[in-house]
Amino acid sequence: MRKDYIIKDARRILAEQIRDNGRNTMNENPITNATGLSAVIPKDNDGYCTVYKLDCADGLGLMTVYQVYPGIQLIYNDFEATSCYWDGNIGKNVLEINHCREGREGSVLQSGSCLYLGEGDLSIHTMDNCTSEMSFPLKHYRGISVVLDLELVSENPPGILTESGIDTADFKNKFCADGSCFVMRAKDDIEHIFSELYSVPDRFQKPYFMLKVQELLLFLCMVNVKQEKQRELYTS
């Protein structure tokens, strides 16, 4: 019997949220009626942080969403389940950057590419390329996603990106040309960016998330995709 773990509504709602300026969406979206969500817990009054609880046949998922900048969300993903299913595509100009902290995650994307993330690995793909099924073979997954609405970020870039002349709209062609998925295996550069995000004191979260998101985007601008793909061939 197939086990259903329905997160399609959460994914779609999150995509809709990042098209908002990232502040008042919770007051405008009837998210509490979404199928597959057992609880939606606003952690403040301005929509900055919201926790989504998702039930499944053999476990539980929690997504803690922070609206860091207009068009940029930082999401803590905690799953204690073996698999999840969802359907429906989301915007092709929305990128999802995933970092695996603990556990394993595997999926086959809409493009046919196989994605496998181990501890410390990073992946980038467009959200319309998301698979209908994700598996967690260890029945445990902990990680971070940074979701970018490329159009909105280009219109409202964070300060440092404006000064550097970087356009995040170029990320789609750089990392996801022809529907591909980019994977960078665990290395010190990735660990440096993400490791401290898992232990930030609450009172420092807002400024620290803003700094770390900008650091991540600057780092991705410097990534040599060709070299990383060659490294992937040698290490896989």
What is each of the regions a protein language model found here?
Residues M1, L37, D46, I72, ...:
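Generic low-polarity alpha-helical segments
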Residues M1, Y52-G59, K229, Y234-S236:
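Intrinsic structural disorder
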Residues R2-V51:
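Short Lys/Arg-enriched alpha/beta "domain-start" segment
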Residues I6, N27-N33, Q73, N93, ...:
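Alpha-helical structural motif
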Residues A34-L37, I41, D58, W86-G88, ...:
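Bulky hydrophobic/aromatic packing residues
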Residues P42-R142:
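N-terminal functional module of multi-domain proteins
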Residues V108-T235:
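Alpha-helical bundle regulatory/interaction domains
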